[in-house]
Amino acid sequence: NPGKGHGNEYYLPEGYQDPDDCLAMARRAKDKGMQIEFTFAYSDTWSDGENQLIPYDWRPYIEGNNLTGDELATYLEGKIYEFTKDMMLKLIEQGTCPEYVSIGNEMQYGLLYNNHKKNNGFYNKSGYLTRFVNAGARAVRETSPESKIVLHSDHGGELLSRRKAFIN
């Protein structure tokens, strides 16, 4: 979780699943001899198929520059890449490189679209989803080529129902 904004009723309290907490959890897991599957949710709140809220700390630039459409997508693509790369480097530096990395959490038909009923134009737009997932994947591959990249669909048992979301 990149920042600390309030998005919905499921708000993560200060210090819970923030970067420092995630690094500490990774250290505990490795100390116990466990493999790590690290999920990048890119949200201050629980992200799921209904809600993919843009992190609070990323919003001032968006709002201050009235970003929409491709400009907004380009900005978010850069933030996803930067945040993913930064966290991966921190994990590697402390000796907890994850074996598996999930780009996004419980994705339905998009990533960072806010809410599917009142969205910013990224819901059900496979081109944007592809750009965002590729930005995170590129950061993982550059920092840890041995880590396996996974995607977490909200309908894992019915993956074909989400197939169109990943077709560009």
Regions found by a protein language model. Give the residues of each.
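Substrate-binding cleft and catalytic face of glycoside hydrolase catalytic domains
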Residues: 1-125, 130-148, 152-154
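Distinct, well-ordered alpha-helical segments
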Residues: 49-50, 157-168
